[in-house]
Amino acid sequence: MTALTLDDMIQLQHLATVGKLVNGLIHNLSGPLQNIGMDVELLEMTLPNEQRGREELVEGIIQRLKRIGEEVDQMAHFIKNTSMRTGTRDETQDLLGVNHLLEQELVFLESNLYFKHQVQTDLKTKGELPRVCDLPRGAAQALGWFIQAIAEAMEMAGTKRLSLEVKMLPPTLHIIFSSDGSPFASSFTAQLNLDRDIADILAADGLNAGEKVTLAALKTCGGSLLFEEAPSGSRTTLTLPIVTP
């Protein structure tokens, strides 16, 4: 049997992520769809027997229709963002600034599109940041996976808040993940090191398959990781090269 190459593993990880998004999308759509159905049924039952004055009746209908419109807008937003991830390379996304990419990832997390969790996030950016296309090929995808991995590890540790700080230190981009409270599992933090061969990363104990592929993908992009832990929390710095001449 032919062994999977790293490119094969990255493609499988991408498909798994799309699967997570579709599953999360279905979960997030069920609530708005149910609300719309209830509002429509309520209107159907109320209108034939409505005894209120015309103005009051019209106002009530308008408010229900506004709520239906908000639910539809929310569904359209989820569908649009999910569809952007169905391809491995999106030229439109390449033109996004890194800050917009990170904002989108955090929206996905907060909407429980990847998985259900209690982790709260905030993002701070300093100065002008590069576009996605200014990073090595595949870096944006690997960055999204790494954010998921950090959030999942925090959820398991019971940590409630994740702060991201992004800044340029040419010729590199620094993304700093800070968390308060409970420490990560040592089996996870011990592997936050890219100063080794890809084969060693893929063979490491203490990580699941997705985490291994994520770290290997970051390694191929020229990324580096520094993990620091203190009594008040932890700090992980991901450094990525900027490839624009």
Positions of predicted regions on the chain:
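Conserved DHp (HisKA) dimerization/phosphotransfer helix of two-component histidine kinases, i.e.
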Residues: 44, 55-115
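Conserved glycine-rich
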Residues: 222-223
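Glycine-rich/acidic phosphate-handling loop/turn and adjacent ATP-lid/helix
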Residues: 172-210
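Short beta-strand/loop element within the Bergerat-fold HATPase_c
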Residues: 159-179
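Conserved signal-transmission helix
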Residues: 1-17, 187-190
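Detector for a conserved hydrophobic position within an alpha-helical segment of the HATPase_c
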Residues: 214-219
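Conserved catalytic submotifs in the C-terminal HATPase_c
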Residues: 118-130, 169
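Histidine phosphotransfer helical core of two-component systems
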Residues: 3-10, 29-73
